């Protein structure tokens, strides 16, 4: 007997064990709801609980697919797909253990069948497959317990139904990668709405789910040519909302990893749409607080663009200089690392356009009191290709950094930084000794002039202070003079009386 599939949006029954009925929206105090949500145990946020039906029919094992004749295979396959569309409550570890095991065994069998059996993916089973996948994976993600959630430090909220969900994702992936997969048939069901819901799942806190979603979306992008532009557009929307509205989306790193592969396959010359994506989305992504979570993937995307079109280099570097962090040393180190990756692929003709503003920023980093920032900036001179670019343009780069290098070599508190600066100055001296000597003399003369001006300023202030004191004494003397004239008169009048 076939098991009836529950609808994907079926709400939890108020009579379900362990769950309280949800009051109408107009009867709920928003503040009390928030405080109650924080007080609940972590496990209460499973998204599967909202679709579980306590009165569902008990599952019974079906015959194995390998044991039935070929004429009955597809009918049994449809029945197993229907079984796998039944949802269970994983918050209660001991509830429906038999049904959970029946579904798990059926999912395992489906994964093995679609991955190894040829001729099983015929057109009539496609709607059943997509329905089963949709019922299991598409759900409203639970709100984060911690509004200040830090992916690097806090433990993620794992999906309790993962024992089943993992097998559904594995089945979906095998389905897309099967030699019998027909995109022309599947596109009736894997449409824009399906893709949009798939993208929304990237906000899941569970990294295991996001890893599967990353691979699956990449396969969908490769199989369905008509959905490619739509996928890129929706990714743009997600990033823009992340930058300018919410600053919270768990799957940014995974989406950027997919886009890095997509960018690598862009045809030349690049379309205007793709260039705008770089300038309006990827560069502003450097401004968000959680940059460290996805910076490696973001930097890869940027470098891929520059390898495709070198003329974008100036826009990228000026954009990075615009968003350069002022107070976060960790982000500053990341920016310096990305800048070195860019300089590794930059063309000499493009380097000339950005060398002055770039190395002025590098000089500011060298003068940073945070030794990691200064150290990372000085490592530029350990890169042979960057060193060759500097040598070819020494007349511009050296004046931009010399003053800072010379001053920091005398004043920095960290001896490691001082040693690195001495090595850099020695390298510059070997590159162009004449220019180095001229800049040294100019720097010393400038410092002497500054000291002279400082001394003149001090003398001026000292003179003004002396003048103030003289005027103050003069004012006091003027006030005392009438009193001195008045004293004899008072004495004389006293004597007459």
Swiss-Prot record:
Disulfide bonds: none annotated. Residues 1-19 have a biased composition (Low complexity). It comes from the Eukaryota. GO terms for cellular component: cytoplasm; cytosol; nucleus; protein phosphatase type 2A complex. It is found in: Cytoplasm. GO terms for molecular function: protein phosphatase activator activity; protein phosphatase regulator activity. The keyword Phosphoprotein applies. Keywords: Cytoplasm, Phosphoprotein, Ubl conjugation. The modification Phosphoserine is found at residues 32, 35, 44, 46-48. Highest expression in brain. Residues 1-55, 475-497 are annotated as: Disordered. Ubiquitinated by E3 CUL3-KLHL15 complex; this modification leads to proteasomal degradation. Signal peptide: none annotated. Induction: By retinoic acid; in neuroblastoma cell lines. GO terms for biological process: cellular response to growth factor stimulus; negative regulation of G0 to G1 transition; positive regulation of neuron projection development; positive regulation of neurotrophin TRK receptor signaling pathway; positive regulation of protein-containing complex assembly; positive regulation of transcription by RNA polymerase II; signal transduction. InterPro entries: ARM-like, ARM-type_fold, PP2A_B56. The keyword Glycoprotein does not apply. Residues 34-45 have a biased composition (Basic residues). As the regulatory component of the serine/threonine-protein phosphatase 2A (PP2A) holoenzyme, modulates substrate specificity, subcellular localization, and responsiveness to phosphorylation. The phosphorylated form mediates the interaction between PP2A and AKT1, leading to AKT1 dephosphorylation. Component of the serine/threonine-protein phosphatase 2A complex (PP2A). This complex consists of a common heterodimeric core enzyme, composed of a 36 kDa catalytic subunit (subunit C) and a 65 kDa constant scaffold subunit (PR65 or subunit A), that associates with a variety of regulatory subunits. Proteins that associate with the core dimer include three families of regulatory subunits B (the R2/B/PR55/B55, R3/B''/PR72/PR130/PR59 and R5/B'/B56 families), the 48 kDa variable regulatory subunit, viral proteins, and cell signaling molecules. Interacts with SGO1. Interacts with AKT1. Belongs to the phosphatase 2A regulatory subunit B56 family. This is Serine/threonine-protein phosphatase 2A 56 kDa regulatory subunit beta isoform. The gene is PPP2R5B.
């Amino acid at each position: 007997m076939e098991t009836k599939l529950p609808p994907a949006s079926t709400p939890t029954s108020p009579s379900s064990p362990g769950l309280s009925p949800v009051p109408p929206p107009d009867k709920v105090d928003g503040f009390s709801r928030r405080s109650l949500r924080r007080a609940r145990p972590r496990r209460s946020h499973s998204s599967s609980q909202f679709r579980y039906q306590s009165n569902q029919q008990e599952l019974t094992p079906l015959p194995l697919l390998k044991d039935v004749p070929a004429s009955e295979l597809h009918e049994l396959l449809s029945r197993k797909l229907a079984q796998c569309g039944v949802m269970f409550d994983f918050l209660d570890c001991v509830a429906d253990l038999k049904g959970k095991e029946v579904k798990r065994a059926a999912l395992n069998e489906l994964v093995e069948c679609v991955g190894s059996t040829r001729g099983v993916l015929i057109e009539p089973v496609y709607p059943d497959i997509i329905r089963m996948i949709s019922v299991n994976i598409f759900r409203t993600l639970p709100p984060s317990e911690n509004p200040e959630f830090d992916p690097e430090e806090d433990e993620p909220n794992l999906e309790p139904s993962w024992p089943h969900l993992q097998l559904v994702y594995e089945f979906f992936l095998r389905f897309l990668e099967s030699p019998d997969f027909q995109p022309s048939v599947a596109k009736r069901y894997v449409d824009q709405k399906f893709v949009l819901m798939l993208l929304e799942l990237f906000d899941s806190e569970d990294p295991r789910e996001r890893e599967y979603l990353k691979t699956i979306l990449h396969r969908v992008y490769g199989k369905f040519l008509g959905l490619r532009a739509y996928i890129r557009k929706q990714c743009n929307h997600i990033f823009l909302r992340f930058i300018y509205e919410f600053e919270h989306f768990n799957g940014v790193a995974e989406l950027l990893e997919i886009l890095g592969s997509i960018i690598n396959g862009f045809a030349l010359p690049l379309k205007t749409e793709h260039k705008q994506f770089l300038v309006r989305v990827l560069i502003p992504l450097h401004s968000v607080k959680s940059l460290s979570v996805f910076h490696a993937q973001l930097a890869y995307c940027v470098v891929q663009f520059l390898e495709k079109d070198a003329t974008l280099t100036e826009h990228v570097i000026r954009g990075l200089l615009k968003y350069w962090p002022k107070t976060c040393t960790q982000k500053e180190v990341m920016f310096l690392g990305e800048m070195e990756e860019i300089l590794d692929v930059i063309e000499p003709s493009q380097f000339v356009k950005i060398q002055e503003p770039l190395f002025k920023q590098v000089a500011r980093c060298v003068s940073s009191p945070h030794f990691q920032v200064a150290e990372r900036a000085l490592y530029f001179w350990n890169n042979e290709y960057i060193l060759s670019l500097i040598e070819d343009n020494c007349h511009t780069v050296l004046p931009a950094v010399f003053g800072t290098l010379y001053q920091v070599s005398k004043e920095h508190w960290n001896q490691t930084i001082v040693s690195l600066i001495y090595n850099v100055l020695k390298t510059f001296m070997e590159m162009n000794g004449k220019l180095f000597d001229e800049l040294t003399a100019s720097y010393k003369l400038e410092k002497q002039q500054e000291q002279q001006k400082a001394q003149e300023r001090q003398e001026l202030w000292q003179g003004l202070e002396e003048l103030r004191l003289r005027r103050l004494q003069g004012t006091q003397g003027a006030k005392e003079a009438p009193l001195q004239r008045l004293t004899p008169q008072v004495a004389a009048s006293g004597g007459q009386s």
